[in-house]
Structure formats: C-alpha cells, structure tokens
Amino acid sequence: MGVLGKLRFKDQAFKLREDAILDATARLLAAKGFDLITMDDVADEVGLSKPSLYKHFKSKEDLVTEAMIRLLDGALAYLGGLPANLGPTDRLRSLLEWVLRVRLSGGLPFLPSTSAHVRAMLTHSLRYVTRALKLHRLLDAVVTDAKRRGELGKTLPNDVILYSYYARTCDPAVEYLRVYGKYDDDAIVAHMLAVCFSGIATAATGKVAQRVQPG
C-alpha cells in the first residue's frame, strides 16, 4: 500500500471511529440527558480510551454540538431527497416519520429546548445555527404551501404550526407508549403521526370546541 493509500485508510478509520462516537453520544443523550453524561461515559460506550476520544472532540460541549449538527444534516438530506411531486403535508408527515424512527432506534436525542446551557452552547455554533435556520426556512415554505392548498389550518400562524411540529420530535409520549403501552415501533409512529396531523378530537367535537369559548 502506497503512502496515499495509507492516508486514505487512516482517514476512513478516523471517520468510522468518529461516527461510532457520535452514535454513542446520541444514545447517551437519549438515555441520560446532557447534564448527566460525561466524556468517560462516551469513551466507555465506544470502547475508546479518553486520550483517543479527545483526539476527536475536545469537550462534551463540542461532542454534543457535533451530534446535533449531524442530526440536522440527516434531516436536511432526507427532506431534500423526497420526491418533487410529494404534497406539502405528506412531506411534513414523511419527515416526522423519519425523525421518530431514528429516535426509536436510539439515534436521536431529545431536543435541548429545556436546557438553557445547551441552547446557549448550540447558538454559539455557526455550523449548527446555519443548518437549523436552513431547515426552519424550508419547513416554513412547506407549511405556507400546505396552508395555501387548504391542507393545514389557515388561521394558525406558521410559527405555531412549526414549533408544535418540532415538539413532536421530542415528545415523551414516544417513550411512554413503548414502556407502558407496550406498542411496537410501527404502532408508535402511526399513533404519533395521527395525533399530529389528525388530532384527538372528532370533527364534530372540534366544531363544538370552537363555539364554546371562555367568557
């Protein structure tokens, strides 16, 4: 093997090890949350020494930020790969199904909306913010198209729809259904999609609720 071949092999091995580290980080984030995981936990999960781990990531903050960036890259790639003729609501439904299945496989951490420290950490990463804004703009356009077609409620602001949609990606009901409801992954995904896009009230109940407003 020549020098270039050895360098390529070394780069590939480094990338594979980095992917394994990020996979382990996602699992630990889902199981323990940001505040409780340590670099020791990650090293043990991957089977690396801490010095080897620090060759890839200098801190827990760097590691978690990279895991979240990889998650956004995956969502952007999935959304971009959907058929061009797929309707806007079906695009939202398909992306949410992908996110839920990734999460159920242990690959998706809870979104850090409840952690001020993690929010501040991520907003200081230009690479993360750039991707988050890009995904938000793309989905905002999808929601606007869906409202124009009458597929989503026109009286709801886009932000209300989008932030409710984002919340479904980290809804604890997913874990409750798996642990206490004993549902399999397909059933959990189907039920979560139904709640998000169809709601829990019948059409008649919804009309009554609109008429009965608090005084």
Q: What positions do the PLM features span?
A:
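Hydrophobic/aromatic-rich alpha-helical bundle segments in the mid-to-C-terminal region
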Residues: 110-114, 147-194, 203-215
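Short, Lys/Arg-enriched C-terminal cap helix and immediately downstream tail that follows
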Residues: 33-34, 65-66, 173, 201
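Amphipathic alpha-helical segments used for helix-helix packing
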Residues: 94, 102-123, 140, 174
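Alpha-helical DNA-contacting segments of helix-turn-helix folds
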Residues: 62-71
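Basic, helix-initiating cap at the start of DNA-binding domains
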Residues: 1-32, 36-45, 62
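Amphipathic alpha-helical packing segments from all-alpha helical-bundle domains
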Residues: 73-76, 122-149, 159-167, 171-174
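Hydrophobic alpha-helical connector segments
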Residues: 66, 79-107, 158, 162-165
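Short hydrophobic/aromatic patch on the recognition helix
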Residues: 47-57
